[in-house]
Amino acid sequence: MGGHLNHQGSGMIHDIWELEATERVLVAILPQQRDLELAREAGWYRVPLARLPSHFAAEYLAFYQPATFGTERWTIRYYAPVLRYRIALRRELLPAEPQHPRAEERYYQIDIGPLATLPLPIPARRLRRVSFINTTIGQLRRAHDVADLFHPAEDAQPPDEIWGAGLAGHSLT
C-alpha cells in the first residue's frame, strides 16, 4: 500500500495513486470552514449518532465542501486516513459551545491522519446536497464529478462479512 499512513498512525501519506483501489472511502460533508480547520488542525471529524449512514466503515474520509466554502464550494478536495472511532458527547468535542441545542447528543469522533489534497478537485456540477457517499479510492481517483461516486464499485471489495464489526478493523473506545 505504498507508504501511506496506516491505521495505527505510523508512516506518511504520499498520494492517492499509491493507495489500494479497493480501500473504502466515506465522503462526508464539511458544513462550515471551522469543520475543515478541526479536521486539519485537531485531526478529527464528527458525525451525530442519529445521522449515522448505513455503511459507516471506511479506511479514508473524503470531504465535500458545500456553498459555505465560497469559491471552493461544491467540491471534494481533501481526504485523510481514518485512525480510530470513539463515541463522545458534543459538548466534549466542542467545549466552547455548552449551550448548543445538541450539546448532550452522542457523536462519533473519527480521528484522522493528515489531510491530503486530491490532484484535481471533484466538482458537483448538478448534485449540490450531499451528506454521505460510500465509495472506494479507485472511484475517487476516476471521478470527474461527485455524481460518479454513486456508480456501483468497479473495484473488487472484500465481502461485507469481513467488515462485520462495522468499523473496518479500527478500534472503538
Identify the role of each PLM range.
Residues 2-173:
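Structured alpha/beta reader/binder surfaces that contact nucleic acids or chromatin modification marks
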